[in-house]
Each structure stands twice: as C-alpha cells, then as structure tokens.
C-alpha cells in the first residue's frame, strides 16, 4: 500500500484529537443514541441484551411514530421490557414530515405527531419505563418557525409533566423565528449530518467537520445549552440518467425507480473524531452532548458496528480501507475484496496485474465492470454500486491468462 507515512501521520492526529486540549471541559460530553426502527423483530429485540455498550453512552432515544411522510401516520411499538433491561435512560421521538403537517400557509400541525408521542409515553409508563424526555423531529419550513414555536409552547402547556425537546437544522440558525423556537422548547438538538441535498455534479459529504464546527459556533451565539446530532450511517444517493436526484437508499430499501447512477455518502469517522476533539474544549461548554444517529443493529449494512462506533466515541481511529483477496489456480485468478473494518465502505476499484503473458478472458460480477488497463485488468465499480458492509467479503471477478504467471492485485486509490 502506498503513502504509508502520510496515512500513519493522519491516524496519529486522529487518535490524539480528543486528548490534546489546552482548556478541557469541566463536564464531559454525554452520549445518547437514536433507536430508529420502524419495526422490531426478535433478533433486534434480543440484541439489546447482548451487546457491549460504548463507554459513556447513557441514553437511548426511541422512535415511537412517524407521520406527515405519506398517506397515513404509523405507530411504532418498541420492546419496553428489553429497553428497560438495558439500564439506559430512555427518551422518545416522533418523526413529522412536511406532507400533511401544515394545516395552512402559517399553521404547522403537530397534533398527530404529539398524539403518537403521548401514546408511546403512556405505553412506556404502563410497562414500568421512565421516560426522561420526548422529542419532536420536524423539518419545519423556515418561514414557519415562529408558528412552530407557538405550537411547541402550547404543547408544553398541555403536557406539563414531560420535558419536550426539538431537533433543529443549521439552515434555521439565521431565521428570525429560531430564537423563539429554542426558547419555547425544554432542549434542542442541532443536526449536523445530511444537511445538503445530494448533487451528482458537485458531491457534498454526509458530514464535514469544518462546516459542522461553524454551525456549532453560530448556535452558541444564542447562549442556550444544546446537543448535536452526529452520524454513524451511510446513505446511497440515487440519480436518473440525466443526473436528477431521486432520493436515497438506506439499508434494505429498494433503489428509486429510474435510478441510473448512485453516489456513496458515508460518514467519515476521522472527521467525526476531529469534531469530538474540538468539542472537548471548554470553549464549547454550551454543547452538552452528542445524539448519535443511529444505534447499530445486527444485519445493518450501511451503519457502523458497535465496536467501530465505540472506537469513535473513545476518539480512536477506525480503519478505513478494505483489503483485496487473490486466489490463483494455475492460469486462473479469482479476485475478491474484504471489509474488516467497523464501517461500510464504498466498493473500490481493483487492479490485477501480471507480466509475460496476456489475458485470455476476464469477467466481473454485477457490482463491477472489467476493462483492460495499466498492463492488466481493472475492475471498476458499476454505476449502481453501493457499499461493502462491515465484515463482508464480496467476489469482484476473475481473469484467465494464456499461461501461468505471477499475479498481483491492489486497490486503486490507496
């Protein structure tokens, strides 16, 4: 692998990012995780009792319903006994989309979402689970923030026994109604990931440390303590043949109809670690903690593993590259790639090289396209390629030479 000195330097800087602080915080950041499941199968329920939790993780924020995203709202019934058994503080969230969430041009309608929250709260109480707070996750149009603030204030008056918090977007920070909104709520979380619409011509990352820090500094000017939401996941952005954005694929979702190109959008753990290092300084004492989106579960393909996530929370570097695998049988070379890291990785381009002979035939699996190049064969990701899941091994293709010769394989771009 090339450029080892640069890579090792980068890892060293990443590892020290949370330790070398001139003015450390008086209180450590607290960590919570969004438990964002639309349904619970037995394996998911069982996994809550059979996992090594990251050090410092104290709270689970559990989805109990969605509305305004389609024709009808949807309740989510979490496994309350299993959640209680984790020993973590439990909060509840509802996701409210803009569709059907506006009662008029200046009337955000939160009634359905708040009903879902109250139902979840009552179910939790009946199951013996104490709820620390409830959160409204609503991407309110910026022009309606003042009206949204009024709805939150009214909800608090009608439901005084709960702590009511809201999620917020960086684009709201300069809006006139933003101060009213965060003053109306009992707490607020600033989302720092997936804040830009994907663009095939001008790729934008899922998360960028420098940009996130700028938003945090803007938010601190309001003088109110808050939390920030950071990503553990990856999205696959989908585009038409003309480059029009069609949506994103997360986990098991199908590609949107008409998808001709995809763009991988992973959360970069190195950038997340660097931001954690910044937030360890007491200058950012208004940032109380991190709300991680989202808690990993067995079978996740586009999410960090529990072990990888724990590394990031501990400000340790996570490996970032997959490894090529070559199996040679005479003149036949089979190529695969292996992801031994704790994060999903974009499918790589793979080069197979040899000397003193030529390729008789070659072929790629459906996720790659084979073409001659560099004195050998290059397997490039298919335009619809996605991610290599943590722990996954995937066959790339094969090359048959006219005669047996030594063969080399490497990942391009490393």
Residue ranges and their predicted role:
Residues 233-235, 239-320:
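Substrate-binding cleft of secreted/luminal carbohydrate-active enzymes
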Residues 17-20:
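Bacterial signal peptide processing site
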Residues 145-146, 150-251:
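Substrate-binding surface in catalytic domains of secreted glycosidases
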Residues 5-14:
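Bacterial N-terminal signal peptides
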Residues 60, 136, 188, 228, ...:
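Conserved, mostly hydrophobic/aromatic
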Residues 360-401:
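Intrinsically disordered, low-complexity Pro/Gly/Ser/Thr-rich segments with frequent PxxP/GP/PP motifs
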Residues 334-346, 354:
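Asparagine-centered strand-capping/turn motif at beta-strand->loop junctions
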Residues 24-38, 63-190:
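Chitinase-like catalytic core of GlcNAc-active glycosidases
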């Amino acid at each position: 692998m090339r450029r080892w000195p640069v890579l090792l330097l980068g890892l060293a800087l990443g590892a020290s990012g949370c330790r070398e602080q001139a003015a450390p915080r008086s209180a450590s950041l607290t960590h919570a995780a969004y438990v964002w499941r639309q349904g619970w199968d037995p394996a998911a329920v069982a996994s809550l009792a059979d996992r090594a939790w990251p050090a410092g993780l104290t709270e689970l924020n559990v989805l109990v319903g969605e509305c305004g995203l389609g024709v009808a709202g949807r309740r989510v019934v979490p496994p309350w006994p299993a959640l209680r058994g984790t020993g973590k503080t439990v909060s509840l969230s509802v996701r409210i989309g803009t569709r059907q969430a506006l009662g008029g041009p200046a009337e955000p309608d939160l009634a359905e979402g708040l009903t879902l929250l109250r139902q979840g709260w009552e179910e939790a109480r009946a199951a013996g689970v104490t709820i620390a707070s409830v959160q409204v996750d609503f991407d309110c149009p910026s022009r309606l923030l003042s009206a949204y603030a009024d709805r939150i204030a009214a909800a608090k008056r009608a439901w005084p026994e709960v702590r009511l918090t809201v999620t917020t977007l960086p684009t709201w920070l300069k809006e006139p109604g933003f101060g009213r909104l965060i003053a109306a709520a009992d707490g607020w979380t600033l989302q720092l990931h997936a804040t830009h619409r994907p663009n095939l011509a001008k790729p934008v990352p899922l998360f960028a440390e420098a940009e996130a820090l700028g938003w945090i500094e803007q938010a601190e000017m309001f003088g109110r303590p808050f939390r920030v939401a950071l990503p553990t996941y990856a999205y696959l952005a989908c585009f038409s043949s003309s480059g029009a954005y069609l949506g994103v694929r997360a986990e098991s979702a199908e590609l949107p109809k008409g998808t001709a190109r995809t763009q991988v959008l992973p959360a970069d753990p190195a950038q997340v670690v660097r931001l954690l290092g910044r937030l360890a300084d007491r200058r950012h004492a208004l940032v109380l903690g991190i709300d991680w989106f989202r808690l990993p579960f067995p079978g996740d393909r586009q999410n960090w593993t529990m072990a990888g996530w724990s590394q990031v929370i501990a400000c340790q570097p996570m490996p970032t590259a997959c490894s090529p695998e070559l199996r040679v049988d005479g003149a036949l070379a089979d190529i695969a790639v292996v992801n031994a890291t704790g994060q999903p990785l974009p499918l790589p381009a793979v080069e197979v090289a040899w000397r003193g002979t030529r390729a008789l035939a070659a072929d790629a699996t459906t996720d790659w396209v084979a073409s001659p190049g560099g004195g050998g064969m290059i397997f490039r990701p298919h335009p619809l390629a996605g991610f290599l899941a943590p722990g996954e091994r995937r066959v790339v293709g094969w090359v048959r030479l006219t005669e047996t010769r030594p063969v080399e394989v490497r990942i391009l771009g490393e």
